[in-house]
Amino acid sequence: MSYFKRNEGTIVFAFASIGFIAFYIINYYIRRCRNRAAAAGDIEEARMSPRRPPRGLDAEAIKSFPSFVYTEARGIEPGIGELECVVCLNEFKDDETLRLVPPCVHVFHADCVDIWLSHSSTCPICRAKVVP
């Protein structure tokens, strides 16, 4: 029996281990280069990165969306008293400030949706693109 036949399992394990280590080293190198480009201020290189953080809206754009006090809008639509903010899952209460998100016209607590929109430019309910 040849040497390779007796140690076939060991050889397969060794090649699999070498492949895994090579994959890890290449992945580490790619991440390191991407982080260096971002730290050096190379915006174009960082922009070409496959993993970009989600972009939200700026504070000025968020504040431009209509806001109102819940007690003023409660009588407009029947059943509005049962509404809740889907971001924090709390019911709307009197004297709380709400914000309306165009174009889908969903309503949320102003503080909740402001935080959401600063990280994401989509509606928390329907994922419609929110454009200021």
Swiss-Prot record:
Pfam families: zf-RING_2. One of its GO terms (molecular function) is transferase activity. Pathway: Protein modification; protein ubiquitination. It comes from Arabidopsis thaliana. The gene is ATL39. It is a single-pass membrane protein. Keywords: Membrane, Metal-binding, Transferase, Transmembrane, Transmembrane helix, Ubl conjugation pathway, Zinc, Zinc-finger. GO terms for cellular component: membrane. Its EC number is 2.3.2.27. The keyword Transmembrane helix applies. The chain crosses the membrane at residues 10-30. This is RING-H2 finger protein ATL39. One of its GO terms (biological process) is protein ubiquitination.
